[in-house]
């Protein structure tokens, strides 16, 4: 028999470290290219992207090879969707649009085995060959809820009362829309709400996360956030731009 694979991102958060997670179009080969770059986890997109039950096993397996926590964002707060995603190999699940305490409690109920929750009793792909999987799984699974509506910000005190959620992630894009600013994540009004939510989460003793690129991550760390996802696509654009500039200079 073998030991249950450790959830690297969860361990690092529990150790007080910063966790950074690339997101964007992914396949197994691309995940492996991220492997040597030192990231804690990979964000597998099942709400706005093509990740589904057919490819979760192989995508999470690629993460396993490089000791990166596979984080799957599911498309809804649905018990069967959450526990089936864990069954197929996810070590962490991100659930969108958590706006109330009851919705947060539902995430825990779906994502944790008894006595914490009521996750369907089935051995995950992560549990293959693990003799005591059910007694260890709750310690190695990770739950992330998205605070991405203004109603969630207004209900944040009650949502933060829910235990067994690893990260309360403030998502600026949808938040901006619910504030009346579609596409306005960079507006000062939205940034103010995001920063206030991060302060409240971190001051409550819970872990705050958000979307942040190179320019903003230092500011959010100062506010107390410790979990960051970011798109790798700007790196691609910046690299392409630099290459084209170099070619143009060399041929002038």
PLM segments and residue spans:
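Hydrophobic faces of well-ordered beta-strands that scaffold small-molecule active sites
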Residues: 19-23, 42-44, 70-74, 93-95, ...
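Short, acidic/polar
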Residues: 23-37, 76-84, 150-162, 212-218
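Conserved anion-binding
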Residues: 80, 86, 90-163, 167, ...
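Short, electropositive alpha-helical surface patch
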Residues: 218-235
């Amino acid at each position: 028999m073998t030991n249950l694979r450790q959830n690297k991102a969860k361990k690092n958060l529990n150790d007080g470290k910063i966790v950074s997670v690339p997101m964007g179009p992914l396949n197994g080969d691309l995940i492996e290219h991220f492997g040597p770059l030192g990231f804690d986890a990979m964000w597998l997109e099942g709400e706005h992207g093509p990740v589904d039950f057919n490819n979760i096993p192989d995508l999470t397996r690629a993460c396993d090879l490089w000791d990166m926590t596979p984080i799957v964002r599911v498309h809804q707060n649905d018990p069967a969707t959450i526990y089936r995603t864990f069954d197929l190999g996810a070590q962490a699940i991100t659930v969108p649009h958590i706006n109330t305490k009851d919705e947060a409690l539902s995430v825990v109920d779906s994502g944790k085995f008894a006595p914490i929750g009521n996750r369907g009793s089935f051995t995950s792909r992560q549990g293959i060959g693990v003799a005591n999987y059910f007694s260890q799984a709750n310690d190695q699974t990770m739950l992330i809820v998205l605070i991405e509506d203004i109603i969630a910000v207004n209900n944040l005190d009650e949502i933060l009362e829910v235990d067994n959620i690893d990260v309360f992630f403030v998502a600026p894009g949808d938040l901006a829309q619910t504030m009346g600013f579609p596409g306005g994540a960079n507006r000062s009004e939205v940034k103010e709400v995001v920063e206030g939510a991060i302060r409240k989460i971190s001051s409550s003793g819970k872990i705050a996360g958000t979307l942040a690129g190179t320019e903003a991550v230092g500011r959010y760390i100062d506010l107390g956030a410790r979990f960051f996802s970011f798109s790798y696509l700007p790196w691609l654009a910046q690299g392409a731009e630099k290459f084209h500039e170099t070619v143009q200079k060399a041929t002038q």
